[in-house]
Amino acid sequence: MKFLKKLLLKILGEKNYLFFTASIFQRLYRTGRLGKEYQDVYFLRSIIHKGNYVADIGAHLGYYTFELSQLTGVGGKVIAIEPVSKFSAVLEKIIDKKRLENIELKKVALGGKGDFVEIGIPIVGNQKKFGYARIKEMHEHLQYAETEKVPNVNGDELFKEIPRLDFIKCDVEGAEVPVFNSLLLTVDKHRPILLCELADKKERIKMFELLQPFQYKAYLLNDKKLHELDVFSDELAISHNHYFIPSARIQQMKHLF
């Protein structure tokens, strides 16, 4: 796989490689050929409905964005947040090509300190890991292939005019808790379903405690069903993807537990 990636990068160049990767993912998704590690993308069909307003924080190459666009429809809205210029360029190209008018792309970071932050693409195992892009100041120990300075905004300010918000997916490589620290007014107002990638027990406890004032419970997805998670348990989670669901939405989702 590493050899194939190197070969494709050499043949296509970085820009075309990223577009190719995004396109292949969508093709595999539509034909149902993605593995279990992508079960959460397929599960969107069970929790997202026409007319929903949703946010994809850390949109990357649109693995969630474009399915969310399809599911929310003409009356819905997808706020795709992607600060890394290499990735946002791919998203823009696909959005324009497919004329996806319900996607609003925001090229900003959330969860950092100050008006700007440095986002870096790290080197892991002698490879440039595009999917591991992260705020550099939170991970200074890593070696980075490249970095760029991007605008950093407050989440509540970004979403203050949105009329509703039904779902937030957040995958920002370790900055999930700081991101939601800047979104507490938004969460309180709209009580969206949350899907967050959390690396370990420490992070999931932080997220759980942050959301306690808003009556959220934690769940994991397994075999197309949501299973309540004891965030304080030492048991190894079956997935890094954690669902946080408020009591206000439990009744309408009871068939999924």
Question: Language-model segments: which ranges?
Answer:
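Phosphate/nucleotide-binding beta-alpha loop and adjacent structural elements of enzyme active sites
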Residues: 1-257
